[in-house]
């Protein structure tokens, strides 16, 4: 089984169509990876599906970097 970190990064690569090496923990979805608002919504939906969690809109707005996505998923499982 892949780690949460690896699974989140795989989803980001698939959803945003970016290279794996671009998906570093500090990368901003919008500024560094070229995502737009629709991309970020689809990314949150993919995370919800992959990890079987629900991310409220107000929380989703705070998930703006790769690390923020990893942290949210890790904490959602607690």
UniProtKB/Swiss-Prot annotation:
SMART domains: PKS_PP (SM00823). GO terms for cellular component: cytosol; membrane. GO terms for biological process: lipid A biosynthetic process. 4'-phosphopantetheine is transferred from CoA to a specific serine of apo-ACP by AcpS. This modification is essential for activity because fatty acids are bound in thioester linkage to the sulfhydryl of the prosthetic group. Residues 2-77 form the Carrier domain. PROSITE patterns: CARRIER, PHOSPHOPANTETHEINE. The modification O-(pantetheine 4'-phosphoryl)serine is found at residue 37. Pathway: Lipid metabolism; fatty acid biosynthesis. Pfam families: PP-binding. GO terms for molecular function: acyl binding; acyl carrier activity; phosphopantetheine binding. It comes from the Bacteria. It is found in: Cytoplasm. Keywords: Cytoplasm, Fatty acid biosynthesis, Fatty acid metabolism, Lipid biosynthesis, Lipid metabolism, Phosphopantetheine, Phosphoprotein. Carrier of the growing fatty acid chain in fatty acid biosynthesis. PANTHER family: ACYL CARRIER PROTEIN, CARRIER DOMAIN-CONTAINING PROTEIN. Belongs to the acyl carrier protein (ACP) family. This is Acyl carrier protein. The gene is acpP.
């Amino acid at each position: 089984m892949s780690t949460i970190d690896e699974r989140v990064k795989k989803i980001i690569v698939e959803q945003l169509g970016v290279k794996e090496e671009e998906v570093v923990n500090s990368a901003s979805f919008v500024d560094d990876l070229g995502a737009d608002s629709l991309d970020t919504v689809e990314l949150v939906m993919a995370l919800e599906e992959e990890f079987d969690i629900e991310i409220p809109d107000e929380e989703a707005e705070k998930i703006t970097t790769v690390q923020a996505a990893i942290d949210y998923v890790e904490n959602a499982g607690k």
